[in-house]
Amino acid sequence: MNRSSLQVLGCYILWGLLPVFWKLLAGVNSAYVLAQRIVFSCVFCLAVLLIKKNGKVVPAILRDKKQRRLYLCCGLLITVNWGVYILTVATGRILEASLAYYMNPLFSIVIGALIFKERLSAVQWVSVALAFVGVMYSVVLYGSVPYLAVIIGLSFALYGALKKGIKAESEVSICMETLSVLPLALGFIV
């Protein structure tokens, strides 16, 4: 197995274990956990930028009002996504948290078609229809409207759509997003 495959495997293992971690923190206020996640993500991302010597792009981004607004919007959307996900898992609604990530691609497709005027082929439409039927079947089995799953899935789809307007590398982008919501997190912690 090559290095890239091992990295992908490692990511999926960590991603799969993440709900267990959040569930272990169920006794802690979810908003506090979210605030800590933002703070530590920001610190870690800043460290990565400094190590990779990419830190000099931050002042240029901070001077650009349009970019600041875009990063703030992305930061707020990822904060909603992270926060609702943490809350969903902490309250034992694991199935709903999982369902969100089945809904997300469908939301992304709708956004792509409506906002970016992307077109799907007939085969792609069949795939979307099958995915939609599968998600709706899961929703019916769930027994109620999985509103937290909708919030998680939709917030991540909107986040992805906004990210199309960001030209920076991924580590710069997530750093700026967490930096933009850092005052909210610090305000909550203090």
Question: Which residues make up each language-model segment?
Answer:
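Membrane-interface interhelical linkers
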Residues: M1-G10, V43-Y71, A122, I174, ...
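Glycine-/small-residue-enriched transmembrane alpha-helix faces in small-molecule transporters
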Residues: M1-Y32, M136-G165
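Hydrophobic/small/kink-forming positions within alpha-helical transmembrane segments
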Residues: G16, V20, L46, G75, ...
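Structural motif at transmembrane-helix junctions in multi-pass transporters
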Residues: G27-Y32, G83-A100, V172
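Residue-level recognition of pore/gate-forming positions within transmembrane alpha-helices
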Residues: I38-C42, Y102-L106, V128-A131, T178-L182
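Hydrophobic transmembrane alpha-helices of multi-pass small-molecule transport proteins
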Residues: C45, V123-V139, I152
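Specific transmembrane alpha-helical segments of multi-pass solute transporters/efflux pumps
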Residues: V57-L95, Y137
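C-terminal transmembrane-helix exit sites in multi-pass transporters
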Residues: L87, N104-V123
